[in-house]
């Protein structure tokens, strides 16, 4: 059984385009697919915990990734829709998360 997490694979392979595709095609809580996984990260500030709980932190990380926002476009009867900027520019947050995921774990 292939139990690989597609989003996790995107981070491991540093594939931002695929990440956006998954995001766009799974609007029903797509980021919840990450589940309760722990990612080792290098501490960015002294004293900070050196790993994060992905499910809790994912919103925060994704928030700065792409121009993701809700809009009332008037066409879908005010239904919330995801909008993405057309420019695929791999942001720092994704790069950092991807690097952190593949970094050797050590204390």
Curated annotation (Swiss-Prot):
Query: An example of a Gene Ontology BP annotation on this entry?
Result: apoptotic process
Q: In which tissues is it expressed?
A: Expressed by the venom gland.
Instruction: Write the protein's name.
Output: L-amino-acid oxidase
**Which residues does UniProt call coiled coil?**
none
Q: Indicate whether Amino-acid biosynthesis appears among the record's keywords.
A: no
Keywords on this record?
A: Antibiotic, Antimicrobial, Apoptosis, Cytolysis, Disulfide bond, FAD, Flavoprotein, Glycoprotein, Hemolysis, Hemostasis impairing toxin, Oxidoreductase, Platelet aggregation inhibiting toxin, Secreted, Toxin
Kindly list the positions annotated as binding substrate.
Answer: 38, 49
Reported temperature dependence: Thermostable between 4 and 25 degrees Celsius. At -20 degrees Celsius, the remaining activity is 20%. Heating at 70 degrees Celsius inactivates the enzyme in 15 minutes.
Protein EC:
1.4.3.2
Subunit details for this protein? Homodimer; non-covalently linked.
UniProt lists the family membership as follows:
Belongs to the flavin monoamine oxidase family. FIG1 subfamily.
Q: How is it modified after translation?
A: N-glycosylated.
**GO CC annotations?**
extracellular region
């Amino acid at each position: 059984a292939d139990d690989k997490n597609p989003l996790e694979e995107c981070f491991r392979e540093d594939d931002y385009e695929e990440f956006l595709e998954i995001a766009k095609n799974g609007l029903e809580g797509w980021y919840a697919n990450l589940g309760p996984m722990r990612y080792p990260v290098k501490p960015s500030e002294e004293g900070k915990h050196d790993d994060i709980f992905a499910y809790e932190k994912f919103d925060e990380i994704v928030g700065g990734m792409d121009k993701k926002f809700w809009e009332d476009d008037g066409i879908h009867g005010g239904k919330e829709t995801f909008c993405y900027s057309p420019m695929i520019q791999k942001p720092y947050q994704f790069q950092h998360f991807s690097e952190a995921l593949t970094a050797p774990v050590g204390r």
